[in-house]
From Swiss-Prot:
Keywords: Cell membrane, Lipoprotein, Membrane, Palmitate, Signal. Coiled coil: none annotated. This is Uncharacterized lipoprotein YkyA. One of its GO terms (cellular component) is plasma membrane. Residues 1-25 form the signal peptide.
């Protein structure tokens, strides 16, 4: 393999390292209190999301190590190449499982947030209503960014699968391998872009929510 490839996939460990929502306590029953309660439930629903991100980062690091090990070998070590590629394929499968769990967490959060939007519609205080709408706008953009990022990550995992299947092929050409690596690189570059957008909207949402809570008289716990 040393003669077959000079580059490696541009896998960025922590590409999914997004920022967590800020949690506070919850209260009451009027529209503002109901909004507050629903927002906190949405944040609580994302705890598994944060846990899965950590697991995915660990798996990404292990996959990088496997890739590096394969690239140090040549075709005289074909059996080792196959064994390492199989381990990498198992790693990709695990990442698919954890990515699904992460996505499930975000879907639950989004469901809770829809309830928050309903509560916001009944707020009569103009200043609080404007701040609630601003927070909702950033949160909706955040969910959209995550959805795009999730789809691209799934695509990247499929491309990784194909890469490791190719590495087990004795007849693999340099051109075919380079083309697949380019596809993996391009996919991970998109993930980084979407991750940045997601993190930006998370920061804006957290700030908008702080403003909302300040206006409504809630204490915001920073973490």
């Amino acid at each position: 393999m040393k003669d077959a490839i000079k580059r490696r996939p541009g896998i960025k460990i922590g590409a999914f390292c997004a920022m967590a929502l800020i949690l506070t306590g919850c209260m009451g029953q009027d529209p503002v209190d109901s909004l507050h309660h629903s927002l906190e439930k949405a944040a609580e629903s994302e705890k598994p999301f944060q846990e899965e991100q950590n697991t995915l980062k660990e798996l990404e690091a292990k996959e990088n190590q496997l890739y590096d090990s394969v690239m140090k070998l040549n075709m005289d070590d074909y059996k080792k190449i196959v064994a390492l590629s199989n381990k990498a394929l198992e790693n990709v499968s695990k990442r698919e499982e954890h990515l699904k769990l992460e996505n499930d967490s975000m879907k639950k959060s989004e469901t809770e947030f829809e309830e928050a939007k309903t509560s916001a519609e009944h707020i009569k205080e103009k200043d609080i209503k404007e701040k609630a709408d601003a927070a909702a706008n950033h949160m909706e953009k955040r969910y959209t960014s995550y959805g795009t990022m999730y789809k691209e990550y799934k695509k990247a995992l499929e491309l990784n699968k194909k890469l490791y299947m190719q590495l087990k092929d004795k007849d693999l050409t340099r051109d075919d391998l380079d083309q697949q690596i380019d596809k993996v690189n391009a996919s991970y570059e998109k993930i980084l872009k979407y991750s940045g957008e997601f993190n930006e909207q998370t920061e804006k949402y957290n700030k908008a929510r702080e403003d909302l809570y300040d206006a409504a008289g809630y204490r915001v716990k920073k973490s």
